[in-house]
């Protein structure tokens, strides 16, 4: 099963309508309150697994300020950390922070972004953003990096960063690889329906393990768990 459950109230897709701050807060609070109740239940036996950690996918500081608390273990911030506000809030609540690589504000298409030296740009980006997070009061152990597959990147950009993942691993922070059913898989396989990209997802899972990634964001947890189990036995 999953070690972390990642929830969000607003789709990251640029072709989906944005929701208001109040609506996002309301949706997230409703889930977090129910999650808190479930997580506090005593296990029926000693062998029962502990409940997964909770990650909340949001980026607007006005929302983050209202939903962070002891029930939230990780803030999945897709804003590329343009300032220190979300980092300060995470430090205040001792919540881990996931920093995603991208450009510009979320929900705005960046389909024509051109990169010169993508991996160097990403390394410089993460060095700058992790410095902001550490200065805000977070420890290195509380920071996770996300290369932002498909975000402000073309097919060849995505393939390059997947081939050169070791350059991000060497930065010394845990790396999350969001591989599940991604557009780059559909482009490689010529498959438009994301639900039919699970085989490609497993290929990227095995590749990510080989490269040294620490965490993987997936939809089909059972299939991916089985693949990881076999890989770990080899």
Please describe what each predicted stretch is:
Residues 1-8:
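Catalytic domains of carbohydrate-active enzymes, especially glycoside hydrolases
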């Amino acid at each position: 099963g999953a070690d972390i459950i990642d929830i969000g109230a607003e789709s990251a897709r640029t072709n989906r309508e944005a929701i208001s701050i109040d609506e996002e807060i309301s949706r997230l609070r409703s889930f977090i309150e129910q999650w808190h109740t479930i997580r506090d239940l005593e296990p029926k036996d000693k062998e029962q697994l502990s409940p997964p950690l909770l990650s909340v996918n949001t980026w607007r500081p006005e929302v983050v300020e209202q939903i962070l608390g002891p029930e939230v273990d990780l803030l999945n911030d897709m804003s590329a950390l343009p300032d220190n506000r979300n980092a300060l809030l995470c430090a205040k609540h001792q919540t881990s922070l996931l920093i995603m690589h991208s450009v510009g504000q979320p929900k705005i298409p960046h389909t024509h972004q051109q990169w010169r030296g993508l991996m160097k740009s990403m390394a410089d980006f993460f060095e700058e953003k992790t410095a902001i997070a550490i200065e805000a009061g977070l420890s290195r152990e509380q920071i996770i990096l996300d290369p932002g597959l498909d975000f402000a990147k073309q097919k060849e950009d995505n393939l390059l960063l997947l081939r050169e993942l070791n350059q991000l691993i060497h930065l010394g922070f845990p790396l999350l690889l969001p591989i599940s059913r991604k557009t780059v898989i559909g482009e490689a396989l010529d498959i438009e329906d994301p639900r039919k990209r699970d085989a490609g997802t497993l290929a990227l899972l095995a590749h990510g393990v080989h490269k040294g990634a620490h965490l993987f964001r997936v939809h089909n947890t059972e299939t991916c768990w089985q693949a990881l189990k076999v890989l770990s036995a080899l």
